């Protein structure tokens, strides 16, 4: 047994300079684990609650001292004495102590910090890498990355409606090669943007955020950048987009409005046709949140229309919650889930969401948040679960590159047993 003897929480900063929670867990035999909790900008309304202080005199109200107090007080009192390898027991005890459906009493940021740090302490105690501790000897699949090289929507200050334009090196043979291909394309894109007089400053997730005339212009630049880097679009590198359509949805008149660019408005059938046209015109392999998070029947309709051609990822739609995922599976809504550990608030629930998705033939994409840190847990998590896809930003900003660097280390550690699926990570669509 490896008994937890001490839990320490503190307030630190994320990649946007906003406060977040860091937790350290100590065991009686010298095991140690540290985790830092990420934070989102575009959040689903059904996400677990991130506890903020609301004190405008500190960090504009975004302080997390209350969450830290909950770590050092009630959560520490509850969890000290647990065997650190009892992840399910630890997480269940914290959920019970909180007593709310959305972890709003103690804060998902407090609970998640303890959950992740406990897992790291257990791995440290056993002398195992985190991915091996969580996934066992079968953890061997390196993920195909979604690299967010152009930012829009809530992640930038430009006039682009879609939140993310991503490249996916589906033709790579290893994660190291995939990262190289992504880096080369990122640099080619920077050169093209600069040559056209567009700014090359980056957004929250490390991608470029210049102004464009419409939502197709970024796609055109991606094609040019892929080719400039020496690759074939749709063969070596495919494109993924995050529409974040809940940001575009007007619930009063039931339309989607391209509010940041052209001002066009679409009914739901028109918006589906609009997206279908983009899929036909560009090598788009994945669309995240193409439909508003509360429109379940419309999600089922777009899945019936496009689900065999393209990966349809539920982010705000599922919020890493197995209750929502179960409903989606039953309705035939979406064919993939985005897994963000802080959307649900514990490691156990994140693992359950991935397992449920895979059992139903859905893909699972393990994801960062726009407010990130140097914590690399999601890199280990995606390998531990053989999920096959990861979304962790662009080829700039250390908070993003930390995850890519960790994936390359893991691939090196796995040696000949490492497997990079590339295009085959999209196992439920016609390729």
Curated annotation (Swiss-Prot):
<feature type="binding site">
    <location>
        <position position="369"/>
    </location>
    <ligand>
        <name>(2R)-2-phosphoglycerate</name>
    </ligand>
</feature>
<feature type="binding site">
    <location>
        <position position="340"/>
    </location>
    <ligand>
        <name>(2R)-2-phosphoglycerate</name>
    </ligand>
</feature>
<keyword id="KW-0324">Glycolysis</keyword>
<dbReference type="Pfam" id="PF00113">
    <property type="entry name" value="Enolase_C"/>
</dbReference>
<feature type="binding site">
    <location>
        <position position="242"/>
    </location>
    <ligand>
        <name>Mg(2+)</name>
    </ligand>
</feature>
<comment type="similarity">
    <text>Belongs to the enolase family.</text>
</comment>
<dbReference type="Pfam" id="PF03952">
    <property type="entry name" value="Enolase_N"/>
</dbReference>
<dbReference type="InterPro" id="IPR020811">
    <property type="entry name" value="Enolase_N"/>
</dbReference>
<feature type="binding site">
    <location>
        <position position="163"/>
    </location>
    <ligand>
        <name>(2R)-2-phosphoglycerate</name>
    </ligand>
</feature>
<feature type="active site" description="Proton donor">
    <location>
        <position position="205"/>
    </location>
</feature>
<feature type="active site" description="Proton acceptor">
    <location>
        <position position="340"/>
    </location>
</feature>
<keyword id="KW-0964">Secreted</keyword>
<feature type="binding site">
    <location>
        <position position="391"/>
    </location>
    <ligand>
        <name>(2R)-2-phosphoglycerate</name>
    </ligand>
</feature>
<comment type="pathway">
    <text>Carbohydrate degradation; glycolysis; pyruvate from D-glyceraldehyde 3-phosphate: step 4/5.</text>
</comment>
<keyword id="KW-0479">Metal-binding</keyword>
<comment type="function">
    <text>Catalyzes the reversible conversion of 2-phosphoglycerate (2-PG) into phosphoenolpyruvate (PEP). It is essential for the degradation of carbohydrates via glycolysis.</text>
</comment>
<keyword id="KW-0460">Magnesium</keyword>
<dbReference type="GO" id="GO:0000287">
    <property type="term" value="F:magnesium ion binding"/>
</dbReference>
<dbReference type="InterPro" id="IPR036849">
    <property type="entry name" value="Enolase-like_C_sf"/>
</dbReference>
<dbReference type="GO" id="GO:0000015">
    <property type="term" value="C:phosphopyruvate hydratase complex"/>
</dbReference>
<dbReference type="GO" id="GO:0009986">
    <property type="term" value="C:cell surface"/>
</dbReference>
<dbReference type="InterPro" id="IPR029017">
    <property type="entry name" value="Enolase-like_N"/>
</dbReference>
<dbReference type="GO" id="GO:0006096">
    <property type="term" value="P:glycolytic process"/>
</dbReference>
<dbReference type="InterPro" id="IPR000941">
    <property type="entry name" value="Enolase"/>
</dbReference>
<feature type="binding site">
    <location>
        <position position="315"/>
    </location>
    <ligand>
        <name>Mg(2+)</name>
    </ligand>
</feature>
<dbReference type="InterPro" id="IPR020809">
    <property type="entry name" value="Enolase_CS"/>
</dbReference>
<protein>
    <recommendedName>
        <fullName>Enolase</fullName>
        <ecNumber>4.2.1.11</ecNumber>
    </recommendedName>
</protein>
<feature type="binding site">
    <location>
        <position position="288"/>
    </location>
    <ligand>
        <name>Mg(2+)</name>
    </ligand>
</feature>
<keyword id="KW-0456">Lyase</keyword>
<dbReference type="InterPro" id="IPR020810">
    <property type="entry name" value="Enolase_C"/>
</dbReference>
<keyword id="KW-0963">Cytoplasm</keyword>
<feature type="binding site">
    <location>
        <position position="370"/>
    </location>
    <ligand>
        <name>(2R)-2-phosphoglycerate</name>
    </ligand>
</feature>
<dbReference type="GO" id="GO:0005576">
    <property type="term" value="C:extracellular region"/>
</dbReference>
<dbReference type="GO" id="GO:0004634">
    <property type="term" value="F:phosphopyruvate hydratase activity"/>
</dbReference>
């Amino acid at each position: 047994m490896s008994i937890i003897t001490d839990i320490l929480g503190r307030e630190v900063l994320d990649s946007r300079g906003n406060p977040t929670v860091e937790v350290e867990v100590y065991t009686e035999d010298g095991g140690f684990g540290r985790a830092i909790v990420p934070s989102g900008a575009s959040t689903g309304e059904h996400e677990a609650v991130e506890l903020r202080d609301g004190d405008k005199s500190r960090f504009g109200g975004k302080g997390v001292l209350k969450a830290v107090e909950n770590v050092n007080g009630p959560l520490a009192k509850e969890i000290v004495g647990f065997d650190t390898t009892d992840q399910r027991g630890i997480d269940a005890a914290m959920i019970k102590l909180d007593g709310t459906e959305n972890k709003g009493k103690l804060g998902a940021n407090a609970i998640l910090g303890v959950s992740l740090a406990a897992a790291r302490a257990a791995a440290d105690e056993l002398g195992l890498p985190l991915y091996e501790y969580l996934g066992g000897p079968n953890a061997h699949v390196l993920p195909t990355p979604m690299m967010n090289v152009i930012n829009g929507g809530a992640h930038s200050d430009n006039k682009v409606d879609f939140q993310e334009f991503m490249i996916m090196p589906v033709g790579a043979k290893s994660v190291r090669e995939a990262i190289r291909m992504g880096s080369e394309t990122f640099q080619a894109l920077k050169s093209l943007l600069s040559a056209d007089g567009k700014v090359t400053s980056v957004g929250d997730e490390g991608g470029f955020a210049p102004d464009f005339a419409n939502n197709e212009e970024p796609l055109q630049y991606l094609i040019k950048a892929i080719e400039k880097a020496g690759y074939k679009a749709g063969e070596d590198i495919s494109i993924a987009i995050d529409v974040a359509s809940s940001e575009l949805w007007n619930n009063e008149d039931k339309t989607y409005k391209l509010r940041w660019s052209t001002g066009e408005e679409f009914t739901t059938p028109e918006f589906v046709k609009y997206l279908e046209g983009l899929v036909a015109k560009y090598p788009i392999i994945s669309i995240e949140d193409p439909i508003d998070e509360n429109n379940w029947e419309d999600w089922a309709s777009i899945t019936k229309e496009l689900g065999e051609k393209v990966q349809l990822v539920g982010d705000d739609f599922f919020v890493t919650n197995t209750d929502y995922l179960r409903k989606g599976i039953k309705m035939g809504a979406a064919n993939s889930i985005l897994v963000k550990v802080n959307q649900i608030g514990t490691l156990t629930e994140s693992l359950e969401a991935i397992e449920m998705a895979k059992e139903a033939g859905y893909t699972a994409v393990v994801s960062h948040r726009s407010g990130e840190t140097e914590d690399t847990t999601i890199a280990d998590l995606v390998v531990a679960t053989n999920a096959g896809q990861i979304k962790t930003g662009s080829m700039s900003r250390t908070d993003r590159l930390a995850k890519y660097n960790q994936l390359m280390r893991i691939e090196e550690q796995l040696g000949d047993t490492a497997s990079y699926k590339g295009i085959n990570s999209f196992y439920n669509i016609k390729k």
